[in-house]
Amino acid sequence: MLVLLLIIGYIIVRGLPGFSWDFLITPPAGGLAGEGGISSTIVTTLYLVGLTLLILVPVGIGAAIYLVEYAPDNRLTRFIRYGVQTLAGVPSILFGLFGFALFVTALHFRFSILSGALTLACLLLPVLITATEEALKAVPRSYRAGAMALGATKWQAVTHVILPAALPGIATGVILCAGRALGETACLYVTMGGSAAMPESLLSGGRSLALHVFYLATETNAMDKAMATAAVLIVIIVGLNGLTNFISRRFQKRICGGV
Amino acid sequence: MEPKIKIRGVNFFYHRHQVLKNINMDFPDRQITAIIGPSGCGKSTLLRALNRMNDLVSGARLEGEVLLDNENVYSPNLDVVNLRKRVGMVFQQPNPFPKSIFDNVAFGPRMLGITAQSRLNEIVEKSLHQAALWDEVKDNLHKSGMALSGGQQQRLCIARVLAVEPEVILMDEPCSALDPVSTMRIEELMQELKQNYTIAIVTHNMQQAARASDWTGFLLTGDLIEYGRTGEIFSRPKDKRTEDYITGRFG
């Protein structure tokens, strides 16, 4: 906890001098000096995280529902579960190489936000599936039996009773994934390119905030700008975590009584 | 009068383990039939055979016939969802959904496609009245069903079942998690409900069976040892094992 506070404090203190309103709304100028702001990278990040969740959430939650509620317990599904767990431990750069080979090259999406988002979705899929599975398994069996005994079909039981009951857990998983998407660099490095320009479409290349920090720190002399960007990133991530806590606590209250 | 439900030659297996052995038993229309017996004798399994809740367990297999109004509920072309609408169930642990009281009761009707708010209001009020819960919750219908006491939760679950207008209500030890006062209220409620519904109740509480039921079946390790009028089973049991059980010599 102390270490965490130290890291966050250090970055914010180092980043603060370089921070200003102008910094947020001007695009990076590029060059060795690392002049300019971070406007285009903020926009790219929003596109990237939004698109990633758009792809990730339906597939991930759908897969988890299938695995928990529908899939029979046989060799194939045990293999799928094993695969999901294994994929969760694969380094992100390997997903990056896979994304480069499939999305950038084979499917001709080139270095683009789309390629990056698809790759991130692959990277985070095991995380979201596991989180959703846990949330679904935590729903008492008696809810399922109760719903089925009232003449609900399996699908009605899932959509009207089980999913709502599991929603706080699932929401936490989704926000966790959003946080990971924000902070990811390695797999984006090889799928989004590093263009600092304002993205024109989802097929444009671009830099997310985290990637920008990496470029600033390794290819320019602008350590202060890197720190300022990192500070912005950290504030967003801390905010997201706060949101997660807020959501799960509110749901808890709503479910376990009270008004 | 023709029994509402007839069980004919039912054998039940979990994988290779036989849980019920050649059961023949009736559940008369608009009467309360109790199934008693020691733990693990198969009484819950027998109850769940009536609305095919055993189907949800893997490795479960049933032979024989369960006839609801002379129609075999295990025939391949029977609609299980429709069966469970006709044969409602109340569980051992009260299991309200994590939703408001209103939404709990309205759940069944909504699943049947009723969306008109006025109709739902009507059904919810009527069902809660029938379950003797209305007066306690009428001002708090938006409150979570889980905020109620155990006894209230169980009556909420009964209201939830009544809302789909079943013909039969199965109760699987509905009072075992409740205090004596709540238990008494549920038993009173059962007497009112039997005017309109056929009720089957599993209980390990023999006093409850003697007090509340019209017919009793005694199960022992998967065999139906004795079945008859509750008064006769408890005053003049024909089988020695029944007598031993109801006098508390084992179980």
UniProtKB/Swiss-Prot annotation, chain B:
Protein family according to the UniProt entry: Belongs to the ABC transporter superfamily. Phosphate importer (TC 3.A.1.7) family.
Database matches in Pfam families: ABC_tran
Protein's name in the database: Phosphate import ATP-binding protein PstB
EC primary class: translocase
Location in or out of the cell: Cell membrane
Reaction catalyzed: phosphate(out) + ATP + H2O = ADP + 2 phosphate(in) + H(+)
Family matches, as PROSITE patterns: ABC_TRANSPORTER_1 (PS00211), ABC_TRANSPORTER_2 (PS50893), PSTB (PS51238)
Keywords: ATP-binding, Cell membrane, Membrane, Nucleotide-binding, Phosphate transport, Translocase, Transport
